[in-house]
Regions:
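Short alpha-helix plus adjacent loop in nuclease-associated cores
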Residues: 121-135
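Short, glycine/acidic-enriched loop or turn micro-motifs at the edges of active sites
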Residues: 16-18, 126, 160
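Hydrophobic/aromatic-lined pockets within catalytic cores
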Residues: 108, 132, 144, 163-173
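Conserved non-catalytic scaffold segment of RNase H-like nuclease domains
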Residues: 1-118, 133-152
Length: 186
């Protein structure tokens, strides 16, 4: 299926030093600009955040301080990113809540005014959440391969919830432990 575009749609993703918008920094940006004629233009850049990347964050995205030590700072490439995104609508995964606000804040931090008015935003995660149930019945089907009958009956719901937890413990033994203190902190 082809997308119907009246102007470019920029799919983009950021890797950062953390989740704090206005406090953390971008270490990688990737953009796929889809033009109305179907042409695809790629932009990718690793960036020196000029602050340390916490080890726990490096373990998530695989980018270390050493890998970006000689890369340009965001300030040095903000202008080219601004021009690449000019006249684009945006798309991403959880982009409306993280990537777009983070990028706009970084642009403002380095003195680049980036206008969002008139742009359209496509968040693939929002589409996923609206079209794929994220309720007890869906979790029961996913983890237990059973259909939940009598949903919203308290007895059926607690039984299903218990079975889901047991299935999660079986499915994710490397990441979760059958210990209430651990599960509480998870």
């Amino acid at each position: 299926m082809e997308l119907s575009l009246s102007r470019p749609l920029a799919f983009f993703d950021l890797e950062t030093t953390g989740l704090k918008i206005g406090g953390d920094r971008i270490v990688e940006i990737a953009i796929l600009k889809l033009l109305p004629n179907g042409e695809k233009i790629h932009y990718h850049r690793r960036l020196n955040p000029e602050i340390p990347i916490p080890e726990a964050i490096s373990k998530i995205h695989g980018i270390t301080n050493e890998m970006v030590a000689n890369e340009p700072s965001f300030d040095e490439v903000a202008g080219e990113i601004f021009l690449f995104l000019e006249n684009c609508d945006f798309a991403g995964y959880n982009s409306n809540y993280f990537d777009i606000p983070f990028l706009v804040e970084e642009l403002l931090r380095v003195g680049v005014e980036f206008e969002l008015d008139g742009r359209r935003f496509v968040d693939v995660q929002a589409i996923f959440h609206k079209n794929e149930p994220r309720d007890l019945k869906a979790a029961y089907r996913f983890y237990c391969q059973k259909e939940l009958t009598n949903a919203h009956s308290a007895v059926a719901d607690i039984t299903a919830t218990y079975e889901i937890l047991l299935s999660q413990l079986d499915r994710y033994p490397e990441t979760i432990k059958p210990d209430v203190d651990f599960l509480h902190r998870y």
